[in-house]
Swiss-Prot record:
Biological process, per Gene Ontology: B cell differentiation; cell competition in a multicellular organism; negative regulation of transcription by RNA polymerase II; positive regulation of protein catabolic process; post-translational protein modification; proteasome-mediated ubiquitin-dependent protein catabolic process; protein ubiquitination; V(D)J recombination
Documented effect of changing R1282A: Loss of interaction with DDB1 and strong decrease in TET2 monoubiquitination
Stretches the record annotates as Disordered: 241-275, 916-946, 977-999, 1392-1506
UniProt xrefs under InterPro entries: ARM-like, ARM-type_fold, LisH, VPRBP/DCAF1, WD40/YVTN_repeat-like_dom_sf, WD40_repeat_dom_sf
Tissue expression pattern: Widely expressed. Expressed in oocytes and zygotes (at protein level).
One GO CC term, this protein: fibrillar center
Domain of life: Eukaryota
Residue ranges of the region described as WD repeat-like region: 1090-1289
Span of the annotated motif DWD box 1: 1241-1248
Gene from which the chain derives: Dcaf1
Protein name: DDB1- and CUL4-associated factor 1
Main localization category: cytoplasm
Source organism of the structure: Mus musculus
Length: 1506
């Protein structure tokens, strides 16, 4: 209570002093007493603030670091008084010439520096720095020292320091000499009379520092007792936890700089010295359960005796003492110590000896002075020369003598951190005696756990750098360093899924994130160092097993640093050659501490740190740690386990670990951050690219590794691999990796990301299930991967592109089973065709070959030889065009393994166009001896050419040209050696090459391969062929059934009498192509009495007399299909209706809305239109398909099944582990109501169990069943329900809603409007079908036609008789988001007339004119002045022009097949008769409805009329 009163008095007194200043400052009164009293108040509260033991490196405003502290309140009161602050700087410091006033002002300014923005004061106020330099050189005490201290604050700004280089050079030398003088005075005074220690005991000081209670043995003791402590008392756990009740160090100070995070200290003034004593005991690690760890003297000491070592004393600046003067001089020197140009001055004037004196608390007995000296020492340690000398002269040992806990110990952390940056100095440290280095590691571990937040930060970064020294690494492991390091993040409140640090301030959250970042960075360095050690062990074991020279490791005092590429190579080597159950001690410890899940949680949570500057670095460090650890199969299996993370709403959910990695790899959270994507991909590669079976001899190679049975090794590895393949596939890994294959941004890393993704796919493709799916995707079926292989994204990254091509070729080989020949575009269909060609038996008539030879001889003027050949071979005198009379020569089929038909640069395409005579090319000279027959397929092939007057004859030529010995020129006997060509290192190699020269080809092999090339060009090659003719080009017959229906509709109609029911095989398909490629608009439905129509969805009524339309206001409107009149209107929802589905009997109707409650409802449509049941949370509902006795509703990823009669919920189908999270999930029944497809997962309705999860390849469409019940269509993928194999991919269905006709033979695909504006604009830019719908043959998924309606489509529906199609079209501008949606009714199978096109063009022009009129108000005035007669004449002329143009214009609704269109145009004469017949058919169909509910729609109309 007394403390509170004192605080209130301080605040009131400062307010009174300011009021007194307001009265007196203009009257010439002496302001020195007021300023002096203010300084005393500030200094008193500074000492109170320091008693709370805040982080000494925390440079925030005290009121921000501790909102309850009085010092912060006093500083805010001062800074709010602008007049006083301006007078303090301008009048009392800059312009006043009165030394007492200057002194008082400088003292106050120095006191308020913790809350002052120094850059503003010293940069904006011209002349103040010059005054301070002048006083620091010439003024009397204490102004001289105050000025020096203020200059220290000014020089922290680098711009100011750079502007005053000369002044600083002079002043540094002056103050260093002053320090030397003051030091000598201290030594002299000590010799005269020993200064008593701040802590006096009856005998000797408690702190002879080598006997400090917390000595170098603390680390060993911590290792021994830590497990027992965790069991007995969590309050004393050796950990660093933010603001936690069981924190060993109670320093809870907030974050400061990005590299020096701090934590908040909640100070309670009520407890006074007793509370401070308790906190100090906590810092020392005291525990009532462990009294042996401390000395009795220290535990019995009061806080007043301990405080001088922990927080220091003498915060007052007056009277000036040598200790205060030295402290302020060191504050000035600290920011200047890092400048290279001042280093000679520091070295010359003995800064090292001075610092060695000041960091010795036995010499100074002033912890504040020692702390300032340590800060200055840290800045000097940045220089290599100084650091080397400091280490050589025992400086490290001096640092280790500083007691813990104390403010000076926190200063040691910065010195160690800066020392670690100097590799030469650290090597010298590592060469110290073992006990010294052990003390360094132990001291730093204590700092990491029990120091202030800045000390923890410095210690963590020290280890990050020093893990490259094996000596430090070994000691770190000996003292259980990994557990103590992991504790830093395991105890962070921001990783607590329950509250996520909700009670923390922004500064505390920032500090926690900094801790996570630094810890992950240290963990990455730790495991990289251990990875190199493990690699050495494996290599040495291999060398012992297989022989060879042992590689000696680098000395432990030498730093080992590795590039990212080297780390990747190490991981690949261990995965490839390590044992199946690799035992790795650090990984085992990490696994035991459950740190894999911890890192996954950190990655997941850090992805949402949008405002944290180092978010990307934190995630990348954590990913790199996991990448290294996944060389161990145990860790890989951890990624297949569930992890608790937060969803978008902040709720805890369970997800598979690998899905987090895949999400990061996809770029879901970090757009265009290539480093993060590469790190995530490396994890996936390590998990899926391990060897199928490992070298068995490695299973027992490491000392300390248990021996394993060799037979179990491949089995275990295969089990792990298979599980990882499965978990990556089930978490949509195929989709992620495929999307990364076509990545183009960031352009500098796209090629490398492609290569890594392709490498992961190669490993994943060893799974037969994955291989089957990939083989059906456009990547292979449409040769997309070959297109990607042609050019790199960035030409400068060709080396990465070469790797991508290598992996892509391997992927093709795995999926197709055939090796890829580089330079060819190979799809699976081509490879299968090449396989058939390779197995074909090639034969040709022998006499045709002899005829070709004879013709060639005649063309060369060798008539007699040709005559002899004709006579001996009994050849006809004229060239035969038919080969049936000749005996064929048979060539054996090529081996089955022939991958493809050979292609050469000037191949088929170039030779098809050439016209040459028969036999234009032949061997120049026959070989001296008949060569042996070469193997089949060893030569490239020529292609055919066409002779001018003869029948089509292939040109046969040798590709390999040979020099002729008789070329008509004199042969040169002597010739100098060529200076180019191949080079042989020795004659032996040359002889070896000569022995391997290929034999010259035979004529038979040339012709055989030439014919095989012809055969390969067939569209559908067959394995068994008749003899090939050399005179006519070969062509395999097209596969065609005997009863194939003709393409011409008239012929097909005539053949129905012979081949019912479609005129032959495929007649129905041809009919569908004819009918569903023609759509004629017949009417438009608009909302009556509305400026803009707002229809959102449509459906035909049960008897199809009415068109049911939902509006954006939630109304349901019924329009007569034939008259176009609105017959009824109902209010169903308060928001836009998105879905309508009437039951087949017409008695019920389902509706869904966007946001109003209920979201969906079931309505009765008998005599009264009323709501039967509501489905409050389901955004989409539909009837069961077969019996329509149930309703299935969709709420996000969850499917609900309801009973229609009672409205009760029967089933809920959802499994969070299987969720695909499609954005537009719509659950649906299969045609027999036994199965449900929800969120891409197939469910059994009877058992309510998930059967299969289909792979995800898109973000939006969840899929529908095909009416045949055998297939599932999910966006572009067609899946077989019997085998779950991927059957086809239909790229044209991408992002389209699929609607089947009543018979299930035709499906419509339309790109629907997006739900929100951002997606809407994105889809308009992305989709070529945003304003069109397409029709497909539902039996083979071949496209029939694309119908461009020139408007964005909201919905479409078809009637049961395939007569009409209703489409909701947006009449608004394509570039705007305004809605004017109408329903346009199309007649199916009718061709659009030219006058319809003209009318539509006129309508478009009128709409465009109206838009122009609305945009320009001035135009309306001009239009009023125009003559109406002239306007009418202009319109008539325009109509005539449009009619003439329309006759020759293109048909907007043209079918996809041009040939079919031409055939249809020929049959236009009979269209009138056909239309009459169609009308009769419609009437007949309309009268055949014999349903019991056939009069329901009539009842509705009658009731409405009543």
């Amino acid at each position: 209570m007394t403390t509170v009163v004192v605080h209130v008095d301080s605040k009131a007194e400062l307010t009174t002093l300011l009021e007194q200043w307001e009265k007196d400052h203009g009257s010439g009164q002496d302001m020195v007493p007021i300023l002096t009293r203010m300084s005393e108040l500030i200094e008193k509260e500074t000492e109170e603030y320091r008693k709370g033991d805040p982080d000494p490196f925390d440079d925030r405003h005290p009121g921000r670091a501790d909102p309850e502290c009085m010092l912060g309140h006093l500083l805010r009161i001062l800074f709010k008084n602008d007049d006083f602050m301006n007078a303090l700087v301008n009048a009392y410091v800059m312009t006043s010439r009165e030394p007492p006033l200057n002194t008082a002002a400088c003292r106050l300014l120095l006191d308020i520096m913790p809350g002052l923005e120094t850059a503003v004061v010293f940069q904006e106020k011209e002349g103040i720095v010059e005054n301070l330099f002048k006083w620091a050189r010439e003024a009397d005490q204490p102004l001289r020292t105050y000025s020096t201290g203020l200059l220290g604050g000014a020089m922290e700004n680098q711009d100011i320091a750079a502007n005053y280089r000369d002044e600083n050079s002079q002043l540094v030398a002056i103050v260093l000499r002053r320090l030397r003088e003051l030091q000598l005075q201290e030594v002299a005074l000590r010799q005269d009379s020993k200064r008593p220690s701040p802590r006096k005991l009856s005998s000797e000081p408690l702190l002879p520092l080598d006997e400090e209670a917390v000595d170098m043995d603390y680390g060993d003791m911590a290792v021994d007792v830590v497990d027992g402590e965790q069991e007995s008392s969590r309050d004393m756990e050796i950990s660093f936890r933010l603001d936690s009740s069981h924190k060993t160090s109670s320093r809870v100070n907030s974050a400061t700089k990005p590299e020096e995070g701090g934590l908040k200290k909640n100070k309670s003034a009520k407890h006074g010295d007793r509370e401070n004593f308790r906190k100090a005991k906590q810092k020392l690690g005291f525990s009532s359960s462990d009294p042996d760890r401390v000395f009795v003297e220290l535990s019995n000491s009061s806080w007043s005796e301990m405080s001088p070592w922990v927080i220091g004393t003498n915060y007052t600046l007056y009277p000036m003492t040598p200790a205060i003067e030295q402290r302020l001089i060191l504050q000035y020197l600290t920011p200047l110590g890092e400048y290279q140009e001042l280093l000679p001055i520091f070295m010359q004037l003995g800064s090292r000896e001075l610092m060695m004196f000041y960091i010795d608390l036995k010499q100074t007995n002033d912890v504040l002075l020692t702390f300032e000296a340590l800060k200055h020492l840290a800045s000097l340690l940045l220089h290599n020369k100084f650091a080397t000398e400091f280490v050589a002269h025992g400086g490290v040992q001096k640092l280790l003598e500083i007691p813990r806990p104390s403010m000076a110990a926190t200063g040691v952390s910065m010195c160690l951190y800066y020392l670690s940056y100097n590799q030469d100095a650290m090597e010298r440290v590592c060469m110290h005696p073992h006990n010294v280095l052990s003390d360094v590691v132990n001291y730093t571990l204590w700092l990491m756990e029990c120091s202030h937040a800045s000390g923890c930060c410095h210690a963590t970064m020290f280890f990050s750098i020093c893990f490259s020294f094996r000596a430090v690494l070994e000691l770190f492991d000996r003292y259980d360093g990994l557990r103590r390091l992991v504790n830093l993040i395991s105890t962070l409140e921001i990783l607590n899924l329950e509250d996520q640090g909700a009670l923390l301030s922004d500064d505390e959250i920032f500090a926690s994130r900094q801790t996570g970042k630094h810890t992950c960075m240290a963990l990455r360095k730790y495991f990289e160092a251990h990875l190199a050690i493990k690699l050495e062990q494996v290599k040495q074991s291999l060398q012992r097993t297989e022989g060879g020279i042992l590689v000696h490791p680098q000395p432990p005092y030498k730093a080992c640093s590795y590039t990212h590429e080297q780390i990747v190579e190490m991981m690949e080597f261990l995965i490839e050659y390590g044992p199946a159950q690799l035992y790795w001690e650090p990984a085992e410890v990490f696994l035991k501490l459950s740190c894999v899940q911890l890192l996954l949680q950190l990655i997941s949570i850090a992805c949402n740190w949008k405002t944290y500057y180092a978010r990307n670095d934190t995630v990348r460090f954590a990913l790199d740690v996991l990448a290294i650890l996944t060389v161990v199969p145990k860790i890989q299996l951890q990624l297949a386990e569930s992890v608790d993370v937060l969803d978008e709403a902040g709720s805890a959910v369970s997800t598979v670990g690998i899905s987090i990695i895949l999400g990061v790899a996809e770029g879901e959270f970090f757009i265009h951050d290539a480093e993060i994507q590469k790190s995530a991909l490396q994890i996936i590669i390590n998990c899926v690219c391990g060897p199928d079976n490992r070298i068995s001899s490695i299973g027992k190679f490491i000392s300390g590794t248990p021996r394993r049975k060799l037979s179990q090794t491949p089995k275990s590895s295969e089990h792990t691999l298979a599980k990882m393949w499965n978990v990556v596939q089930s978490n949509n890994g195929i989709k992620v990796l495929l999307s990364l294959l076509s990545i183009k941004m960031p352009i500098t890393d796209a090629d490398q990301i492609r290569a890594l993704a392709c490498k992961a796919l190669v490993g994943l493709s060893r799974s037969s299930t994955v291989r089957q799916i990939i083989s059906k995707l456009p990547l292979f079926s449409s040769c997309q991967i070959q297109q990607l292989m042609k050019e790199p994204v960035l030409q400068d990254k060709r080396s990465d592109h070469v790797k991508f091509c290598k992996y892509a070729a391997e992927l093709i080989e795995r999926v197709s089973g055939k090796p890829l020949l580089i330079g060819t575009d190979v799809s699976l269909a081509r490879l299968q065709k090449a396989d058939v060609v390779a197995q074909s038996r090639i034969s040709f008539p022998e006499k045709e070959l002899l005829l070709l030879i004879r013709n060639h001889l005649i063309s060369k003027g060798l008539g007699e030889t040709a005559t002899v050949l004709t006579r001996e071979a009994d050849l006809p005198m004229t060239a035969a065009s038919h080969s049936s009379a000749f005996t064929p020569v048979t060539a054996a089929a090529s081996p089955v393994s022939l991958p493809r038909t050979p292609r050469i640069a000037n191949g088929i395409a170039s030779r098809l166009g050439s016209h040459a005579t028969v036999g234009a090319s032949a061997p120049s000279a026959p070989p001296a001896h008949p060569p042996p027959r070469p193997p089949q397929g060893s030569l490239p092939l020529p292609g055919p050419s066409y002779a001018g007057n003869s029948p089509l004859i292939g040109r046969i030529s040798f590709i390999r040209e040979r020099p002729s010995p008789c070329n008509g020129r004199k042969i040169r006997v002597l010739r100098q050696k060529s200076d180019h060509g191949a080079y042989s290192q020795s004659p032996a190699i040359k002889k070896q090459l000569d022995r391997h020269l290929p034999s010259p080809p035979t004529l038979d092999s040339i012709i055989t391969e030439y014919l095989r090339e012809q055969h390969a060009r067939c569209k559908n090659p067959v394995a068994t062929c008749p003899p090939f003719s050399l005179f006519t080009p070969h062509q395999c017959p097209e596969p065609k059934q005997r009863r194939q229906a003709p393409i011409n509709f008239t012929s097909r109609l005539n053949r129905r009498a012979s081949f019912p029911k479609y005129g032959g095989v495929d007649g129905g398909c041809f009919d569908r192509h004819l009918i569903f490629s023609r759509f004629r608009p017949i009417s438009v439905f608009r909302e009556a009495n509305e400026d803009e129509s707002g229809f959102t969805c449509c459906a035909f009524s049960a008897r199809e007399r009415f068109l049911m339309l939902g509006t954006c206001t939630g109304q349901l409107k019924l329009y007569n299909v034939f008259s176009g009149q609105e017959e009824a209107s109902y209010n169903c929802h308060n928001s836009a209706i998105t879905h309508l589905e009437p039951s087949r009997d017409g008695s019920l109707l389902l509706t869904s809305a966007t946001w109003s409650q209920p979201l969906s409802a079931l309505w009765g449509m008998k005599s009264v239109f009323d709501m039967k049941h509501s489905f409050t949370e389901d955004h989409y509902v539909e009837f069961s398909k077969h019996s329509q006795d149930r309703v299935i509703g969709t709420k996000g990823d969850i499917a609900h099944i309801y009973d229609i009669q009672t409205g009760n919920k029967l089933l809920t189908l959802f499994n969070p582990d299987l969720a695909n999270n499609y954005k537009r999930n719509c659950a649906t029944f299969n045609p027999t109501d036994d199965l449900v497809l929800n969120d891409g997962v197939l469910w059994d309705v009877r058992s309510a169990q998930a059967i299969h999860k289909f792979d995800k390849f898109n973000m939006n469409i969840s899929g529908v069943f095909h009416p045949n019940g055998l297939e599932v269509i999910i966006n572009t993928e067609i899946w077989d329900l019997r085998t779950f194999h991927l059957l086809h991919t239909v790229p044209a269905l991408d992002q389209c809603r699929v609607v089947f006709n009543h018979t299930g033979t035709v499906m419509y695909g339309a790109m629907l409007q997006a739900d929100d504006e951002d997606d809407l604009l994105e889809e308009r830019m992305k989709s070529p079908f945003g304003s069109s719908f397409r029709t497909f043959n539902a039996t083979d998924y071949k496209p029939i036609a694309t119908i461009d309606v020139k408007r964005n489509i909201f919905d479409l529906c078809t009637d049961t008789k395939d007569c009409y199609l209703a489409v909701i079209e947006n009449q608004g501008s394509m570039d705007a988001l305004n809605m004017d949606t109408v329903c346009r009714l199309y007649e199916v199978g009718r061709q659009r007339l030219a006058e319809d096109e003209d009318e539509e063009e006129d309508q478009e022009e009128e709409e465009q004119e109206e838009e122009d009129d609305d945009e320009d108000d001035d135009d309306t005035d001009d239009l009023d002045e125009l003559d109406t007669d002239q306007l009418l004449e202009a319109e008539l002329e325009e109509d005539d022009n449009n009619e003439n143009a329309g006759e020759d214009g293109d048909n907007d609704f043209s079918p996809s097949d041009e040939e079919l269109a031409n055939l249809l145009e020929e049959g236009e004469e009979g269209e009138d008769e056909d239309s009459d017949a169609d009308e009769e058919v419609e009437l007949i169909l309309g009268d055949t409805d014999s349903s019991d509910n056939s009069d329901l729609e009539d009842d509705i109309i009658l009731s409405l009329n009543e």
